[in-house]
């Protein structure tokens, strides 16, 4: 849906490359071509960094490839956090486990034994994640997580997106 016209004449100064979770065919073809190239040159797996490179190349964005923050690929005011997981059948996967890396309860909250109080550790990890989203949303809107589910034999792939919220 298009942005509404407002009486004060102001508009959100961002444009979405495509509607949420509706990746255009040409984008999927470009991503597929990038992944096929990696397999052709002998790659035995597709890493998270490869996924970020493939997506950035396909959208014409910049892959920050940074171990901190959640904005992995950026294009203008839009950003994506890139995740990749393996699954026996990507097209039938109903649940996947995403790892929220870049979260250190020890560093951020001084929790030296994360198993001592699981509830406290979970609350700490969620607090770190929410703060990372706050920081990313200061610079980017919309902010999405793009997940590549790949089969173990690397012959099947599925992509889906989630909007990042606190």
Ranges and model annotations:
Residues 1-69, 75, 84-166:
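Nucleic-acid endonuclease domains
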Residues 79-81:
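Short hydrophobic-acidic sequence motifs that mark active-site Asp/Glu residues
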């Amino acid at each position: 849906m298009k942005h509404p016209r407002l009486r004060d004449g102001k508009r959100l100064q961002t444009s979405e490359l495509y509607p949420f979770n509706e990746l255009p065919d040409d984008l999927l073809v470009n991503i597929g071509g990038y992944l096929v190239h990696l397999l052709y040159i002998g790659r035995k797996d597709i890493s998270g960094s490869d996924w970020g490179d493939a997506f950035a190349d396909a959208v014409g964005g910049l892959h920050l490839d940074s171990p901190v923050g959640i904005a992995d690929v950026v294009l203008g005011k839009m950003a994506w956090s890139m995740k990749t997981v393996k699954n026996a059948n990507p097209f039938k996967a109903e649940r996947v486990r995403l790892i929220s890396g870049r979260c250190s309860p020890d560093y951020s909250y001084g929790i030296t034994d994360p198993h001592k109080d699981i509830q406290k550790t979970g609350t700490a990890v969620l607090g770190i994640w929410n703060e990372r989203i706050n920081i990313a949303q200061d610079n980017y809107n919309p902010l999405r997580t793009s997940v590549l589910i790949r089969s173990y034999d690397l012959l099947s792939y599925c992509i889906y997106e989630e909007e990042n919220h606190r």
